């Protein structure tokens, strides 16, 4: 599975002009399931997303995770948005191939699993809508962006 995480001051996702998820300071994670991914890969990716140290401590060093945003135990927001295009094969030609992405039914199942697992482990989880045409807006903080990937 893949997650492109961005440290944000705020972010929101809309579907048909309706806000489906919004957070203040935290992480926006664009999430993609690849062919052959499993719940175990989703669990490993979620552990990375929740534990990845991308927020600055008092000394200015990236040493804090979204679970401990301020060093005093305050959790930041986590906005999860499905994005199958992260799995695109761009190695040949000028049109991406999405063959590496999980089929839609499997992608939805794994994204739903990922969201449920995140909600069980983190207090502030918002989402987009799988397969919908979404408008995502955010205010990057830094910017700080990381590509995280786990394999089945």
Swiss-Prot record:
Q: Which UniProt keywords apply?
A: Cytoplasm, Hydrolase, RNA-binding, tRNA-binding
Which named protein is this?
Answer: D-aminoacyl-tRNA deacylase
Please list the GO terms describing molecular function: D-tyrosyl-tRNA(Tyr) deacylase activity; Gly-tRNA(Ala) deacylase activity; Ser(Gly)-tRNA(Ala) hydrolase activity; tRNA binding
Q: Does the keyword Phosphoprotein apply?
A: no
The organism's place on the tree of life at top rank: Bacteria
Q: Which HAMAP family match?
A: Deacylase_Dtd (MF_00518)
Give the protein's biological function.
Answer: An aminoacyl-tRNA editing enzyme that deacylates mischarged D-aminoacyl-tRNAs. Also deacylates mischarged glycyl-tRNA(Ala), protecting cells against glycine mischarging by AlaRS. Acts via tRNA-based rather than protein-based catalysis; rejects L-amino acids rather than detecting D-amino acids in the active site. By recycling D-aminoacyl-tRNA to D-amino acids and free tRNA molecules, this enzyme counteracts the toxicity associated with the formation of D-aminoacyl-tRNA entities in vivo and helps enforce protein L-homochirality.
Q: How does it assemble?
A: Homodimer.
Give the source species. Answer: Paraburkholderia xenovorans (strain LB400)
Question: Which reaction(s) does the protein catalyse, per the Swiss-Prot or TrEMBL entry?
Answer: glycyl-tRNA(Ala) + H2O = tRNA(Ala) + glycine + H(+); a D-aminoacyl-tRNA + H2O = a tRNA + a D-alpha-amino acid + H(+)
Read off the domain note.
Answer: A Gly-cisPro motif from one monomer fits into the active site of the other monomer to allow specific chiral rejection of L-amino acids.
Q: What is its EC number?
A: 3.1.1.96
Q: Which GO terms describe its cellular component?
A: cytoplasm
What the record says about family reads: Belongs to the DTD family.
A GO BP entry is: D-amino acid catabolic process
Task: State the compartments where it is located.
Answer: Cytoplasm
Which segment of this protein is annotated as the motif Gly-cisPro motif, important for rejection of L-amino acids? 142-143
Q: Which InterPro entries match?
A: Daa-tRNA_deacyls_DTD, DTD-like_sf
Name the CDD domains for this protein.
Dtyr_deacylase
């Amino acid at each position: 599975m893949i997650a492109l995480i961005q440290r944000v001051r705020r972010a929101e996702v809309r579907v048909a002009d309706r806000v489906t998820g919004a957070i203040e300071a935290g992480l926006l994670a664009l999430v993609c399931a690849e062919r052959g991914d499993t719940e175990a890969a989703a669990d490993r990716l979620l552990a990375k997303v929740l534990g990845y140290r991308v927020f600055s401590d008092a000394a200015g060093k990236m040493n804090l995770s979204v679970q401990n945003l301020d060093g005093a135990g305050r959790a930041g927001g986590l906005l999860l948005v499905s994005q199958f295009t992260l799995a695109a094969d761009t190695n040949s030609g000028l049109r991406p191939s999405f063959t590496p992405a999980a089929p839609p039914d499997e992608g939805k199942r794994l994204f739903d699993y990922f969201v449920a697992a995140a909600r069980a482990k983190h207090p502030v989880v918002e989402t987009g809508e799988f397969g919908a045409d979404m408008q995502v807006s955010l205010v990057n903080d830094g910017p700080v962006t990381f590509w995280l990937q786990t394999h089945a």
